[in-house]
């Protein structure tokens, strides 16, 4: 890790007040990062010092000893660090990952007594990017991390999956309407259909809130179905009531958690969840009136998040549609409503102007949501 320039007084304060994370035996050449900075570690690397207290995300990619250019999948984990805290971790050579098992208290205390000698092997926290990190995570609490992180705490770019059925025997394959092993495929589609159904290994999946697929209440009339399909406030409120009953603002922590897992952890499923959750928030006009403070904070969150991603990232390769512009177009249209809080309305107008100037996104065209909506009625629903 390269030396960083820091104000001497700040460096002194962080040296005595900051937290320290020691990682023993991490192989030379491993790509390692904390929050918004990453490096290739050298042979003397033992961890990071002078870390400001709070939530942090540490991540790494192992390298192939035989071919150092071959880098493994990104893995990471969140830590909640305290003033003058010391966390001791070690590299597992067998699993090629950081072992998150807590070190014995005796080892931690011995390490604390030896910190001055260890100091030369610890890289200083990149304080220059702390402001950016806080802007991306200011709604992520320790409770958010505990609720959402996998049971094993390891966040991996690639899911650790197992087949739902082992299908070791012919009778198992017949039960799934699959041909015998070794039978030649007649088409690409048939080959895909033969692939076994997979599920995440227990304890490895991120525990995101379940988002509704049905946007209207049971027994809704056709008119109500249409209403709730255009304004998703009912569906959003069910999520807030079930997942965040004491504080609706906590949904913003989950939005930030998903974004960090995607941006720094390279977790595609987290990006998909971020999109679905953002879509639910942006298409809920009635909720903007009820939860105006939540939406004021949402704009600030999006301002910082969108600064980290190229403008064309959200464009669908096939359709050329931009998910974000179409979603925000509906949001800005709803935010213009006279019923919406004046502060929220003004902030939305400024944010729209900022995006138009920075990314040249066009929000002036009529949103697709203004076109007639065709909704699928539940089976058995009668038209009045």
From Swiss-Prot:
The keyword Transmembrane helix does not apply. Keywords: Acetylation, mRNA processing, mRNA splicing, Spliceosome. One of its GO terms (biological process) is spliceosomal tri-snRNP complex assembly. CDD domains: Aar2_C (cd13778), Aar2_N (cd13777). InterPro entries: AAR2, AAR2_C, AAR2_C_sf, Aar2_N, AAR2_N_sf. One of its GO terms (cellular component) is spliceosomal complex. The modification N-acetylalanine is found at residue 2. The keyword Transmembrane does not apply. Belongs to the AAR2 family. Component of the U5 snRNP complex that is required for spliceosome assembly and for pre-mRNA splicing. Interacts with PRPF8 (via RNase H homology domain). Component of a U5 snRNP complex that contains PRPF8. This is Protein AAR2 homolog. The lineage of its organism: Eukaryota, Metazoa, Chordata, Craniata, Vertebrata. The gene is AAR2.
